[in-house]
């Protein structure tokens, strides 16, 4: 199977599993918004965002390094060396974090200290096991594990939030147990002990892996800072209720991020494997064209359908979130395209540029938030995120020319439709929204028809085997 078909197959297999977690996220929205006040949900969302900020610091993203180095590992001995070094470093990092966090939160007498620490440890374990499954080529196991994660999250959330009425701590406990159980299943299926041995620990390999992963940390942290600064400053300047509304508004644009995530997981591997191929420029351009059309279709489709589905998922106390969704949807588009460019930088093992661009964007995001949130509230947070993501997109696009030239063609029809869709969205006239949705649907199908055909054949053949 050629590289492009393999990428499509892996993307779909990953999507089948990961889609369950996104479906879960939306199935649970009515539960969250009915059982938790905007202030409570804002607190939970802040803790989740804080955990994503701490994770790269604790692990130095060694799981990402492990995945990349496993792609180049030609024999079992090389794989054992990479995996052993990763696990050894992760265990040390986790122990140090637990000790420091336990002391700090113990002194502060923070209400959610214990479960929050366990929540972070469970995320470390899950990230490590997922990277191991992907790196060893067990894509179906990776996909299946995400399905297990989604199903267990539903059950546990109902138990902890509805039956036990534990509120914010219940959400944290549910996710902690689901993450841990899923990670254990993956590690048992992979027979982890066969890949880990004290004699296979090599400092030289560890240093090489850290040289790859450490520059990724500022990149990841900066993306998180863009999100965290919004939430932190909204909480400080406008209250936890405003943060809760902003968090719900972000739930819908995250559909796009999740859809791209299906592709991105497979793309990092594919972009690296084809690097030595003479046809890599043609391959990159072909994928670039397809992913742009696909993401633009989702942007238009999500904005067009939102007037009809928003009230089905969200309690009326969160109605203000409706106004910010289009801004965040467009912002996520630029995030995803920046990540696409990042996949190429990763293939060339140039991770430094990824960090420098996002650090600059994070600083701009913070400055905008400080200046404008006191006056414009959630709108300021939304636009600061859009501006920051756009800056990363433009700069990475410029720097990419040093490695590869991607062909560009301005899509006038898309931008005209986007403006028209935004007008009907905010006018919120039923007839106009219906007409606009039909037009957008036709456009999305027409522009992605060949892409959908490319997906269907290899995926069907893969599962027949």
Where would I find each of the regions flagged by the language model?
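Interhelical loop/hinge segments that connect adjacent transmembrane helices in multipass membrane
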Residues: 1-3, 114, 140, 164, ...
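Signature of the first transmembrane helix
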Residues: 4-63, 98, 119, 149-154, ...
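Transmembrane helical elements of multi-pass membrane transporters/channels
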Residues: 10-25, 149, 171-186, 190, ...
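Helix-loop junctions and terminal segments of transmembrane helices
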Residues: 30, 58-74, 253-289, 342-347
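Alpha-helical transmembrane segments of multi-pass membrane transport and lipid-handling proteins
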Residues: 58-59, 64, 84-115, 184-185, ...
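Membrane-interface junctions at transmembrane-helix termini in multi-pass inner-membrane proteins
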Residues: 69, 123-146, 329-360, 400-402
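Hydrophobic alpha-helical transmembrane segments
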Residues: 144-192, 359-364, 378-398, 441-444
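Membrane-proximal transmembrane or re-entrant/amphipathic helices at the cytosolic face
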Residues: 425-465
